[in-house]
Amino acid sequence: MKDAFSESKIAGIKLRNRIIRSATHEGLADDFGNPTEELIKKYEDLAKGEVGAIITGYAAVMQNGKSPLINMLMIDKDEKIPYYTELVDRVHQYNTPIFLQITHCGRQTFSRTTGMPTVAPSPIKDKLYNEDIPHELTDSEIDEIIKCFVIAIERAKKAGFDGVQLQLSHGYLLSSFLSPHMNKRNDKWGGSTENRFRIVKKIMERAREKVVDYPILAKMNGYEKSKDGIKLEEALIIARNLEKASCDAIEISCGIAEEGFVGIRGEFPFDMIAQHNHLMQKMPKILYPFIKPVLKHSFASPEPRYLYNLDSAIEIKKNIKIPVIVVGGIRKLEDAYNMIQREQCDFIAMSRPFIIEPTIVKKFKENKQQQSKCIDCNYCQIGVEKTPVKCYYGKM
């Protein structure tokens, strides 16, 4: 019988167990987007803690796709490969697979960060980043982005990563192409689900020509809060399309950034937002008592607080044969066991529990702990805008 600690494989890559560290922005790259010694040590700690596999924090495939969050990884130049090779070799010493998540932030950034205009499938302003209306990508610009994703996959392979994960969730560029909420085009890149999926399909086709059977995973939304966003019915179609496009495994998440704490449930960290968020810093503090209830109503996380992507993962797993990974509000060892034993998913992924306890998998395995110490205060999610990721445990 399968259980959370049984050995398993993704695209032939052996995992010691079925618990994965989901992609988490650490804010520990250097000024050029190369991994630093401090970041490598964080990954070594995860590997020593016996995690099944690590998915790195996101790495941008080109300069105009760079995140406004501090010290993002970049995979936009060949010169970066040796830095990543060092990272991979250090993690592999502990027999832990590591996958590089690659992305383009699209409209979820600032032109002052990238030095270029923000871009998107459609000229729709992001409500959270509040940047100028993004430039609508042309055919040739879309083709250049596809090329950059493919080259990034080639670089990841050369660096020794066990595979890559395409970031198709949370409102970043590929996510915004997939979502009818953000993609209002009426050409071959918009309209039908097939057209909105076209950019992902092209990335997969061209990547397979270059790297053949190199593992390519994807992280996608099972649903979005926006009325015209992706719903489960369309997520099933996208998942089937990913399988047809030779994707090796799919991680199920939800939500986009401007929808607030949909994809990362828990407490509404107003004090942390007031101190770190660029929009709040422009407002007079005298208005904070009036702003707080409005923001909490608009952006606070909905229910349920835990296992909130499980229903989507169950339905998607029924429709595809490749492995399904579920992330979101997984905090108890019992839940991890149940999801795997009941075959509701093939793997589980966590993010915040690893921020507070890099060795949580080892503690689970040795039965020293039954639940994560994470209190879902979400301070870490806001603090990383300006400082490297850490657990605040609900305190400033």
Residue map of PLM features:
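Flavin-dependent oxidoreductase catalytic cores
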Residues: M1-M396
